[in-house]
Amino acid sequence: MSERKLFTSESVSEGHPDKIADQISDAILDAILAKDPEAHVAAETCVYTGSVHVFGEISTTAYVDINRVVRDTIAEIGYTEAEYGFSAESVGVHPSLVEQSPDIAQGVNEALEAREGQSDDFNVIGAGDQGLMFGFAIDETPELMPLPISLSHQLVRRLAALRKSGEISYLRPDAKSQVTVEYDEHDKPVRVDTVVISTQHDPEVSNDQIRQDMIEQVIKAVIPAHYLDEKTRFLINPTGRFVIGGPQGDSGLTGRKIIVDTYGGYARHGGGAFSGKDATKVDRSASYAARYIAKNLVAAGLASKAEVQLAYAIGVAQPVSVRVDTFGTSTVSESILEAAVRQVFDLRPAGIIKMLDLKRPIYKQTAAYGHMGRTDIDLPWEHLDKVSPLTEAVAALSEGA
């Protein structure tokens, strides 16, 4: 009998408490970068019933109306009714932002390499912290993402679209999805085993109505029919009721959905969150660079699955390590791939910032529905413009091996 395995990933909607916090943090970051592209920002947000606290460290010449940014973001998500227990115009906003530590700033503003006299513009900026970051790509989907997280994101995006268009009028902003995919003995996805959708709703609607709408208008609209069969389980609002939600039901905090933000647990994670951080924070920028590398390696046909690890020391520009793992799927040795990556990509913080143009206010749009594999927005780390340079570098290195 062939061995089959299950893998599960989840996503959450923009109205989930943790995602509200992420979006507020990134909205503040974008508002500052729009006026001061050189700003250093680390903005954290906590939300709960009737209150938003914004705290962290910022170095900027710009003035931003934090109160207005917070309220506008909450309204865009859909929390505009008092009965939700959390609404844009009545919520209390409590900012507490201070200047970045000078001890950290001296290493970011002048990297170790620059202090040692290595005259290169890209040696000026040091990494904002030590740490390790991962990027991943796999040929399971057109966007080169694992299928479970791809489907999970699509489900909650579809829910939000139906809510905002008014097509399903009883929907409220908070929601979660979870998809279990069955893989065959060759690690290829063959079917969807279980779909879980929990969606906040108005009190009057029946569970039968919710179930019917979720299956017909969400699940079947998103998941290709060949993945669904008579054994696929649909678990819709399994508790039986989800009226109280959002920050009224649970507190939310920036950076608590790092697996949702990346690969749904299918690949490793270095532990650093993204939202509210400018690109000198390698937790964010190097994770984007690692995805960029992995996606271009797979798109180039150099591997069918690739995981890239980058690691940094605070105040040092060059990464302390670069690793490529293709899980036995590469067409050449991983040492050649690593050498090609070092040739093609400048992985110093300033190099990443220039390569991906990361001083722009592009971050709020990433704060819900995933930072990787997005097909609905244009993100530079999803571009495939390094396929040819990588292919050429690998060919040259292979000849010289």
UniProtKB/Swiss-Prot annotation:
Cofactor detail note: Binds 2 divalent ions per subunit.
Cofactors named for this entry: Mg(2+); K(+)
Chain positions recorded as L-methionine binding sites: 57, 100, 250, 281
Binding positions (Mg(2+)): 18
Main location: cytoplasm
Pathway: Amino-acid biosynthesis; S-adenosyl-L-methionine biosynthesis; S-adenosyl-L-methionine from L-methionine: step 1/1
Any one GO biological process: S-adenosylmethionine biosynthetic process
EC number of this enzyme: 2.5.1.6
Binding of K(+), residues: 44
Keyword Magnesium: yes
Record-stated family: Belongs to the AdoMet synthase family.
Function per UniProt: Catalyzes the formation of S-adenosylmethionine (AdoMet) from methionine and ATP. The overall synthetic reaction is composed of two sequential steps, AdoMet formation and the subsequent tripolyphosphate hydrolysis which occurs prior to release of AdoMet from the enzyme.
Protein name (database record): S-adenosylmethionine synthase
Organism expressing this protein natively: Streptococcus equi subsp. zooepidemicus (strain H70)
Organismal lineage: Bacteria, Bacillati, Bacillota, Bacilli, Lactobacillales
Gene: metK
